């Protein structure tokens, strides 16, 4: 079995790392370069940077931040937020990103995913899906895709959208439960399982990690290939090394 990845996530707005609850109530968490360096030293497998207001604010890419981080951090960087064109993908890769995450722009123009993967390869295109449960209690579970930092409903079914994006060449799906984001109540394992079972590419579970058991559950019960977290790492509750040691004790293969 391939090693499972632990990925700290840095949500960035106006050049600072922030963390919210249910995509709002943002709280400052520090300088992105310092935080990224810390996670590199702790043994993170990758780092994900998301400019969470670039699309809704119509802002350009955070190239200078990525250049600064890439010069000091030597693990893969995934970067998203405000990516609208294949040219944007090129600019971020040139700045030092290893993978590019697209979200709102993939929904506005699904061909972007096809074109970007054709030019740069599936391995560096990640489609981020922000999903909120739309089914009532007792109904078959359904989740709707939201865009623009969780502010805009699309009417799209999250599982079907993940299937389409994988078919268009996306190399990974970054799946965030909006219902669990920042709540520390654990992943939406039903959502994670539904998408993981539906697509032939790796799924990164995101949204809701409150402790180390939640990370392990994302792999063992959610069937994710990687787990992403922010709050438990940003505020010193746990280190990445502690998370890896816990997962190894649970019998999950990780790179120590």
Swiss-Prot record:
Alphabetical list of Pfam families matching this protein: His_biosynth (PF00977)
PANTHER family: IMIDAZOLE GLYCEROL PHOSPHATE SYNTHASE HISHF, IMIDAZOLE GLYCEROL PHOSPHATE SYNTHASE SUBUNIT HISF/H IGP SYNTHASE SUBUNIT HISF/H
Active site: 11, 130
EC number, as in UniProt: 4.3.2.10
A Gene Ontology term for the protein's cellular component: cytoplasm
Predominant subcellular localization, coarse grouping: cytoplasm
Keyword terms of this UniProt record: Amino-acid biosynthesis, Cytoplasm, Histidine biosynthesis, Lyase
Organismal lineage: Bacteria, Pseudomonadati, Pseudomonadota, Betaproteobacteria, Burkholderiales
GO MF assignments: imidazoleglycerol-phosphate synthase activity; lyase activity
Organism in which the protein naturally occurs: Cupriavidus necator (strain ATCC 17699 / DSM 428 / KCTC 22496 / NCIMB 10442 / H16 / Stanier 337) (Ralstonia eutropha)
Record's protein name: Imidazole glycerol phosphate synthase subunit HisF
Subcellular location: Cytoplasm
Subunit and interaction comment: Heterodimer of HisH and HisF.
Gene designation per UniProt: hisF
Keyword check for Lyase: yes
Disulphide bridges: none
Domain of life: Bacteria
Keyword Nucleotidyltransferase: no
